[in-house]
Amino acid sequence: MYKNAEYLLEKYVEEKDQDKFKILEKIYVPNAKVTFEIDTDTISFPTEILGNKNIAQVLSAEFNRKYDHVQTYYLSRSFPQINDFTISNQGWLVIMREKEDNSIRVGTGLYDWIFEKQVDGNLKISQHNISIGVMLCLPGLPFSFLNELQSKLPYP
């Protein structure tokens, strides 16, 4: 099912953005770990999340209660693989709307991934670091602005 890292990373974006947390938890190993490095005060996450179910809950279910129309994009289709099981400094961009005040959010940062090969040959995520460098809050813009931005970019 998840035989290569590129496919797995596309599934990560789709399941996270579309609030499919039950599917998202299946792409992480049960004892997976997600850590955060956040260089902005406009968004917050716990310092670390342990376990695939908790990861899916925070990154998908809880996140999608606060934001909607979430779309995450990889800034390059060339994944910077260090080896078969590690991808480092994968640039990303997210465009979404905050439900509470309808402000548009635009953020960017880096992902680092470590994968584990399973007995069945599939890859799963064992460690994931999310660095958030910028998270702009753009209040007062019409919803059409969000749609226009998202329509210009290939998803995921």
Q: What are the language-model segments listed below?
A:
Residues 1-14, 18, 22, 26, ...:
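Short, low-complexity N-terminal intrinsically disordered segments enriched in polar/charged residues
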Residues 30-91:
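A solvent-exposed, acidic/Ser-Thr-rich amphipathic alpha-helical stretch
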Residues 63-69, 99-106:
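Short, solvent-exposed secondary-structure boundary motifs
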Residues 2-10, 98-104, 114-156:
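Terminal "cap-and-tail" regions of soluble proteins that handle hydrophobic small molecules
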Residues 12, 16, 43, 47, ...:
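Conserved aromatic-histidine-acidic binding/catalytic patches
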Residues 51, 107-109, 154:
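Glycine-centered flexibility motif
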Residues 78, 84-92, 103-110, 127-135:
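Eukaryotic helix-grip
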Residues 73-79, 108-117:
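Hydrophobic/aromatic beta-strand elements that line small-molecule binding cavities or substrate pockets
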